[in-house]
Regions:
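Gly/Ala-rich phosphate-binding loop of Rossmann-like dinucleotide-binding domains
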Residues: 49, 157, 267
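Conserved phosphate-binding/catalytic loop of the ribokinase/pfkB sugar-kinase fold
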Residues: 95-130
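Conserved phosphate/ATP/ADP-binding segment of small-molecule kinases
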Residues: 147-237
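Short beta-strands and strand-loop turn motifs
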Residues: 104-106, 131-139, 166, 184-187
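Substrate-binding N-lobe of the ribokinase-like
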Residues: 29-89, 306
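Positively charged, low-complexity intrinsically disordered leader regions
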Residues: 1-23
Length: 310
């Protein structure tokens, strides 16, 4: 099985506040709090671990509260490689009112110097081999030149590492320069990239194929939420449906879990259709857990049996 790595330059403590009702400009009361060490790459590694796949999570940690972050990674049994820097790991706060949609508040993070990025890059390049899988996920922290991050990713790809990029820090031109194995843009990014909205599955499939043809990635996967997902390599496209969830608990982290599913199945050498069915099963099952908690293996299995390639 191929080795899997994740890279998180911008981790966060994910705080989830559940409440009966939220009203702006009023005092609001919280019924329960859930706190997880997160960041997109960490979420991917955690989803993999819960579903029986090991990975190594490279992560930059602020010294002020990094010990608490590491304690949670150890609790979850994750294999991780930390790079320490001055400052404090940020917090992402999500309000979950029972009677309305969730609201997210993101705090700022530490600054990362080029020297810290170089230290992380050396650690990653020392272990990654041709054919290994790596997910670079989350936005770039302050202090880094985007060109330096692009150069890091290009070196990985030049060494034969199959790189997924899931970050809103890059423009279409940046992605064309990086040319990763896979990207998973959201609807806003697609509009930004192509100038046209996605209104249905066929629109999404066309958009995915167009992005590949423009050279932004070898493959493009677009999530349609509860309506499934599409995938294209520019030549072939697949549209997948997923079962409807009567009462989804939280959609936060579902995209990260979807990518975990891609890595989980690809590392095992499974065929394209099975990889994509696994991916949407991970993502859908993640909506059945609180906050950014990973999808349970039994839920993934149940959902997988109900996925379809249309």
């Amino acid at each position: 099985m191929k080795a899997i790595y994740t890279v998180t330059l911008n981790p966060a403590f994910d705080l989830h506040y559940r409440m009966t009702h939220f009203e702006a400009q009023k005092e609001n009361y919280v019924d329960s709090i859930l706190c997880d060490a997160g960041g997109k790459g960490i979420n991917i590694s955690r989803a993999l671990k819960v579903n029986g796949t090991d990975s190594t999570a490279f992560v930059i940690l602020g010294d002020e509260n990094g010990a608490a972050f590491e304690a949670q990674l150890k609790r979850d049994g994750l294999h991780y490689a930390p790079i320490h820097t001055a400052g404090r790991i940020r917090e992402n706060i999500t309000l979950h009112p029972a009677d309305s949609r969730e609201t997210r508040i993101s705090l700022d993070t530490f600054r990362v110097t080029p020297e810290i990025l170089h230290e992380l890059e050396k650690s990653v390049l020392d272990v990654c081999r041709a054919g290994d899988l790596l997910a670079f996920a989350g936005r770039n922290p302050k202090g880094l030149e985007k060109a330096d991050v692009i150069a890091f990713l290009r070196r990985l790809i030049a060494n034969g590492v199959r790189v997924i990029v899931d970050s809103n820090s890059f423009t279409p031109e940046d992605l064309t320069e990086i040319h990763p194995w896979l990207i998973k843009p959201n609807e806003q990014e697609i509009v930004s990239f192509l100038g046209t909205p996605v209104e249905n599955a066929q629109d999404a499939a066309n958009a995915a194929a167009e992005l590949v043809k423009r050279g932004v990635a070898e493959e493009v996967m677009i999530s349609l939420g509860g309506d499934g997902a599409v995938w294209s390599d520019g030549q072939d496209s697949l549209i997948l449906s997923v079962p409807k969830l009567a009462h989804p608990v939280s959609t936060i982290g579902a995209g990260d879990s979807t990518l975990a599913g891609v890595l989980h199945a690809t590392a095992r050498g499974l065929d394209r259709e099975t990889v994509l069915r696994t991916a949407v099963s991970f993502g859908t099952a993640a909506c059945m857990t609180e906050g950014t908690l990973p999808p349970k293996a039994e839920d993934v299995k149940a959902v997988f049996g109900q996925t379809r390639v249309l």
